[in-house]
Regions:
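A structural signal for alpha-helical segments
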Residues: 17, 124-132, 170-173, 177, ...
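Solvent-exposed loop and edge beta-strand segments that line ligand/cofactor-binding
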Residues: 14-24, 95-109, 166-179, 273-287, ...
Length: 333
């Protein structure tokens, strides 16, 4: 419990699945318990992520971004991204099977910061913030600040080519969960920059020095964050239906009856009948995505719209991940 050099593997102690790597599972699904019941363990988990800043900065740089881009799969604190890029071979074509989560499933960066802020709000642990928290928030916001794309024809910033929580949909634009969580990460950074400038001048000076080494400044970052937040596209509920699009073009996807797959005794049975490319073109999700967003940020729409989105997306979710039903159950309450 006291060793902040390691996190919690996705399968915990139940098996060797995922090689013991830490995913967003830690901050989003495991962390809330520790935050309330054993806050000292919650802090240790966040310290693990702080120690992983080296690897997160390394990943950002390797992908052409600034700041800290947390790995989708994390192992030792200095390793950076450890998600395998090739996971096997297509037995029909002989082509390698590519795993894109380590490259374009990027919401984990803001998931970590969301958990960090929840911890601070619940515990008031100022020592943690002074030692680690402010730096983590600012460095991850620098990533998002460099990640946003200005789309001239839409007159807004967007986040294109990602995987959201629903991993059956790859290379999507403006995944609602990703965009909202990135916006929150940026908002918190602008807030804490103002805070440390006024109240934590030593920390402000430390971070300013770090920015200057990168050829920028906290003032410039704060200004850019405030500007980009106002122009970042946040998908809104449809005026007629109240449904938030999971990503651009979601409502144009094919609809099929998923009941036979939802009621199967094992997961993944949809792939007995359809290829991954087929499922990519269907309103068929692996796990909570919009419902995950409504769980994390329940105030982004009205209770009536929230209920409509729950009904709409649950019918289109296969719950092929063990992370899905718990979130649906909580949100239903």
């Amino acid at each position: 419990k006291e060793d902040n050099r390691v996190g919690i593997g996705a399968k915990a102690l139940s098996g060797e699945g995922y090689k013991g790597h830490s995913f967003w599972d830690t901050e989003t699904f495991i962390f809330p318990y520790f935050q309330m019941a054993e806050p000292e363990v919650a802090r240790t988990l966040l310290e693990f992520r702080y120690k992983g800043l080296y690897g997160a900065r390394k990943k950002a740089k390797e992908n052409g971004y600034k700041g800290a881009m947390y790995p989708w799969e994390a192992a030792w604190i200095s390793d950076g991204e450890v998600t395998p890029y090739i996971t096997g071979v297509n037995v029909h074509t002989g082509e390698p099977l590519i795993c894109l989560t380590g490259v374009i499933e990027q919401h984990i960066t803001s998931d970590i910061i969301f958990a960090l802020w929840q911890y601070y709000t619940a515990t008031g642990d100022q020592d943690f913030m002074d030692r680690y928290g402010y730096e983590m928030i600012i460095e991850t916001a620098r990533f998002w600040n460099s990640r946003l794309e200005w789309i001239e024809e839409n007159n807004r910033y967007e986040i294109r080519d990602v995987i959201g929580p629903d991993e059956y949909k790859e290379h999507v634009d403006n995944n609602a969960y990703t965009n909202y969580m990135a916006h929150e990460n940026m908002r918190l950074a602008a807030q804490v920059i103002a805070c440390i400038r006024d109240e934590k001048k030593d920390i402000y000076g430390k971070m300013q020095k770090l920015m200057q080494e990168e050829g920028t400044s906290l003032e410039q970052l704060e200004e850019e964050l405030k500007d980009k937040m106002k122009k970042l596209y946040l998908p809104q509920p449809d005026e007629k239906t109240g449904i938030i699009p999971q990503f651009d073009g979601y409502f144009d996807l094919k609809e099929i009856d998923l009941s036979v797959y939802k009621n199967a005794s094992v997961v993944g049975t949809i792939f007995h009948d359809y290829s991954g490319e087929d499922v990519q073109k269907m309103q068929a999700g692996k796990q909570a995505d919009i419902v995950e967003l409504l769980y994390q940020m329940e105030d982004i729409t009205t209770p009536d719209n929230k209920a409509k989105n729950y009904v709409y997306y649950e019918a289109r979710t296969l719950h092929d991940s063990s992370l899905s039903k718990a979130i649906h159950s909580i949100t239903a309450c």
